[in-house]
Swiss-Prot record:
Protein name: Uncharacterized protein C1orf226 homolog
Keywords, sorted A to Z: Phosphoprotein
Pfam family for this entry, one: DUF4628
Modified residues (Phosphoserine): S214, S215, S241, S250
Region (Disordered): 1-47, 68-264
Bias (Basic and acidic residues): 194-212
Length: 264
């Protein structure tokens, strides 16, 4: 800001002050001009130095004037506000503390909320047993499994199932027998062996064979007899009945095909 003022004022001063120096050699006659011409360069050098010194002096005066000038007249550009009470507040720290305490008293603090003594439980969950939720899921699931396993044999023994449901109680008894007793008295849940499942499927196959023997099949209803053993082949000629034909893959040779969708 100050540099701009100096550059704006110095050319005007230089032009006004340089005219007397330039007009003096031109005022005398032509003879005087001839004597002045050899000393022209020296005059120009001296005038330039004088102008430089004059510009410095004017710039210093302008800077001093701007510094002494009141800040209110300059406006808001390039001015800084000075807080005159800052020193007093720093000097008297006790007064500031009193003011803060007064402000705190004017706006009292709210008491913190009371601590939660117990957690809120939803009303739908009355007990953990109803929703099968417990803090110790492993023990509770084992206990619940033992109760179910102990209850199933009683139900199967009390009510005799039909031949179609004969495989269900046997499967439950197998699960109970396969459960190994732990030292704590609990029963470990059996895991089906997928690798050696052929050996485990033997009793199930026996049950299915018994069911087939007890209930007449569709082939027998239609007049066809199934040969299950070589003994039946030996006994069939003695009865006088014609020997049964060997089963072939072609359906046309066997005659009318039984309707598998109709269960009489």
């Amino acid at each position: 800001m100050f540099e701009n003022l100096n550059t704006a004022l110095t050319p005007k001063l230089q032009s006004s002050r340089s005219f007397p120096h330039l007009s003096r050699p031109t005022a005398p006659s032509a003879a005087a001009q001839g004597s002045v011409e050899p000393g022209g360069p020296g005059l120009w050098v001296g005038s330039s130095q004088h102008l430089k010194s004059l510009g410095k002096a004017v710039g210093a005066k302008v800077n001093d004037f701007l510094r002494r000038k009141e800040p209110s007249s300059l406006g808001s550009v390039g001015t800084t506000e000075v807080n005159k009470t800052a020193g007093a507040q720093l000097a008297g720290g006790a007064d500031g503390d009193d003011g803060r305490s007064a402000l705190q008293e004017a706006f009292p603090r709210l008491d913190p909320p009371p601590p939660a003594t117990r957690k809120r439980t939803p009303r739908a969950l009355k007990t953990t047993q109803d929703m099968l939720i417990s803090s110790q899921p492993v023990l509770s699931s084992l206990e619940y499994g033992t109760e179910l396993s102990s209850g199933q044999p009683q139900v199967s023994s009390s009510a005799q199932p039909s031949p179609a449901d004969a495989s269900q109680p046997e499967a439950t008894t197998e699960v109970v027998d396969r459960d190994d007793a732990l030292p704590n008295g609990e029963v470990s849940v059996s895991v089906p062996d997928l690798i050696h499942k052929d050996g485990q499927d033997d009793p199930k196959l026996k049950v299915t064979e018994c069911r087939r023997a007890s209930s007449p099949g569709l082939m027998e209803r239609n007049g066809l007899k199934l040969s299950l053993s070589p003994i039946s082949l030996a006994e069939s000629p003695e009865d006088g009945s014609p020997p049964p034909r060997a089963r072939t893959s072609s359906v046309d040779n066997e005659g009318p095909h039984p309707d598998l969708l109709s269960f009489e």
